[in-house]
Amino acid sequence: MTEQQPVAVLGGGSFGTAVANLLAQNGVPVRQWMRDPEQAEAMRVNRENPRYLKGIRLHDGVEPVNDLLATLHYSDLIFVALPSSALRSVLAPHAGLLRGKCLVSLTKGIEAQSFKLMSQILEEIAPDARIGVLSGPNLAREIAEHALTATVVASEDEDLCQRVQAVLHGHTFRVYASSDRFGVELGGALKNVYAIIAGMAVALGMGENTKSMLITRALAEMTRFAVSQGANPMTFLGLAGVGDLIVTCSSPKSRNYQVGHALGQGLTLEQAVNRLGEVAEGVNTLKVLKAKAEEVQVYMPLVAGLHAILFEGRTLNQVIERLMRAEPKTDVDFISISGFN
């Protein structure tokens, strides 16, 4: 049997830990780097990530570490699970070590200052690296508990996709491939905003019709925006689009859903985020997405409505009334409507 090449995972959160465990279960030696030396030591001793994945045993093949330079030297396949706000500051000082390596982003976020996706930041930091993204309906705890799960690895580099499939694909985790890196990654980032809306709707006792309407109109809205930026609309009918949107907008395990649910219960945004105790990328994404949609003149009423509630002092009832009074458009944007003429 061929010995597996070592792999690195950057980030000590729930998803980074779940992916590290998956790799180790497939016989891959893994170093999982995190900034907090106390967290690394506790995970190494107790074989658990109590803050982010309490009750899930850390596989013996995962080595939690705090030495970033040694970790970057360790492997030429690196999964990057850093918060969007930290990715650039962590990796830019070590750009030279990333040359020629395979960097796969696991982070579903957008950089506020530039509106760049995480893989685009990786490209900027390390133009000679091979870049990919992993995205889909992937709740970290369910992955860690071996629930049947599928995901998408996306890259223009077919060999990179095949390599990621080889190390991650297993009995409970299926890995599909796509060449639409931008569309796959954008879908993962955009759906976080709509999960906040869905969580609010549930907390407020809205009906199943309402929740279904929100999810399908969210899909139309995020697809419309993505296509304006050059993505393939068909990507949004797959795991990284509608698949990720459904699970994130339906599950109390979703961090962004939890924030929305707390808001619907009457908490302030600050209180909701503090109660979560983790990063909810949707809050940051909402701000930059609202500005970008206005800049490129893409109609995104759900984004505008949530922004009005969280940052403009509008009430939910005011926003709902405005949304329901808006002129209804066609149901699906990307099919011929000539029959209506």
Swiss-Prot record:
Database matches in Pfam families: NAD_Gly3P_dh_C, NAD_Gly3P_dh_N
Give yes or no: UniProt keyword Lipid biosynthesis: yes
* Entry EC no(s): 1.1.1.94
The biological pathway it contributes to is: Membrane lipid metabolism; glycerophospholipid metabolism
Question: What is the active site of this protein?
Answer: K191
Q: Where in the cell is it found?
A: Cytoplasm
Q: Where does NADPH bind?
A: S14, F15, R35, K108, A140, R255, V279, E281
Residue positions binding sn-glycerol 3-phosphate: K108, G136, K191, D244, S254, R255, N256
Report the PROSITE patterns cross-referenced here: NAD_G3PDH
Query: Some GO term, biological process aspect, for this entry: which one?
Result: glycerophospholipid biosynthetic process
Q: Which cysteines are joined by disulfide bonds?
A: none
InterPro entries (alphabetical): 6-PGluconate_DH-like_C_sf (IPR008927), 6PGD_dom2 (IPR013328), G3P_DH_NAD-dep (IPR006168), G3P_DH_NAD-dep_C (IPR006109), G3P_DH_NAD-dep_N (IPR011128), NAD(P)-bd_dom_sf (IPR036291)
Record family assignment: Belongs to the NAD-dependent glycerol-3-phosphate dehydrogenase family.
Q: What HAMAP family does the record tag this protein with?
A: NAD_Glyc3P_dehydrog
Q: What does this protein do?
A: Catalyzes the reduction of the glycolytic intermediate dihydroxyacetone phosphate (DHAP) to sn-glycerol 3-phosphate (G3P), the key precursor for phospholipid synthesis.
Annotated protein name in UniProt: Glycerol-3-phosphate dehydrogenase [NAD(P)+]
Q: What is the lineage of its organism?
A: Bacteria, Pseudomonadati, Pseudomonadota, Gammaproteobacteria, Pseudomonadales
